[in-house]
Amino acid sequence: MTTPEDSARTAALWKPSAARAARSRITDYRQYVCRTRSLDLPDTTALWQWSITNLDPFWDSVWNYFDVAGSRGAGPALAKAEMPGAVWFPGATINFASQALRHAPSDAPAIIACNEAGDQLELSWTELAARVASLAATLRARGIVRGDRVAAVLPNSVEAVVAFLACASVGAIWSLCSPDMGAASVLDRFRQITPKALIAVRSYRYGGKIHDRSTVTAQLVESLESLALYITVPGPDDPGNTTSRSAHLATLAWQDAIAHDAALHIDPVPFEHPLWIVYSSGTTGLPKPIVNGHGGVTLELLKVMALHNDLHAGERFHWFTTTGWIMWNCQISALLLGATICLYDGNPGWPDAGALWRFADRVGLNFFGAGAAFHTGCMKAGVVPAGERLRSTLRTVGSTGSPLSPDAYRWLQSELGPEVWIAPISGGTDLSSAFI
């Protein structure tokens, strides 16, 4: 017998309006699959069942639906299904940066970057592509080639996105740490990957204070013997002049590294070629390096951003994160769809618990994600989350990092209104994505 308690547990917490469901990315994709594969998939449950029992045609349809920038190659999407050792898209060539920058040239914003001091920088797709092209040319000129590791210690800034895309353009392998980490913690990670280049900031702002990291970066430069190039990035109240030198490597200032007027050249790489290295938590020994490839990341995060998050080109996406959390990697993947990524660098609770919501209102977010602890903290602090502009733009609120409590869920839904989708997710660093 079904009890009232059972019914309450199984009842849907939220359903999209008929209009929102009709214009959603998942509906469009389901109709595309039915049309191109001669299938009858009446709803998303049927689509999900087809996707998990037909891996080869499903992932082939994902490539084709998004018209991925790259060469598909001949043969099946899944050439070898045995694990370990599965082989995906043999013969395909791709580059994450090609998909991300296919939306240039355009005067529309690719990045809106804000910090806790109130500074705001808007970078168009054309400007982003130009900076990436310039830095990639510098990396090539300084001997950085496909397969080299490029390590970075940067905040959640435009420079981090530009550096990552330039690294990917060359076919080098990216690895990033947050500037709040100590030298020992960074070295525990970077020593394992023997980077050839280091891009690091000398200071950063957090909680209303400027934190000098010049001593830490000097330790990294001297301790990473594999380095041949060091690009120093100015922080707040930093004149940007290159001051540190080392006998065993070339040192460049960031502004000099992006000063070239270069054509954008992105190297196509094999589907499985490494894109980035992230790390396990290090609770059992040294943090374990985890490698994800260009092809898998590009297809998976196109799928997640569009079909799971219902993100559209031109919309404004933000997930509060530091560069030490996998959500930084997920956030920048919104560029793959032509969405605008809205970065926030700083303490989300400074000068008060409403700071991040004011940022969301100022830039007019369509998707706003943060950790569950952040949402709970705002609820307890009595924050009014939605300003006038945000009430007209916000469609989805994401949550992760820990379970979102029922109280916090109900608070968000009550404050933001019934049309806003509250969407908690669960995933992992090892897959750079979410599985729930």
Can you say where each PLM-predicted feature lies in the sequence?
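AMP-dependent adenylate-forming
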Residues: R35-D40, A97-S124, D237-P239
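Conserved AMP-binding/adenylate-forming core of the ANL superfamily
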Residues: A46-W50, A97, I111-L165, G182-L187, ...
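Gly/Ser/Thr-rich phosphate-binding loop
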Residues: A339, N366-G369, M379-I436
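Conserved AMP-binding/adenylation subdomain of ANL enzymes
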Residues: T298-R316, I326-N366, A381-G382
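Structural core segment of the AMP-binding/adenylate-forming
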Residues: L165, S169-Q255, V363, G371-A372
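Conserved helix-loop-beta element of the AMP-binding
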Residues: T194-L198, T215-Y230, F317, C342, ...
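Conserved adenylation A10 loop of the ANL superfamily
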Residues: A117-G118, I277-P289, M305
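Conserved pre-ATP/AMP-binding loop-to-beta segment of ANL
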Residues: D107-P109, I231-T232, R245-Y279, L286, ...
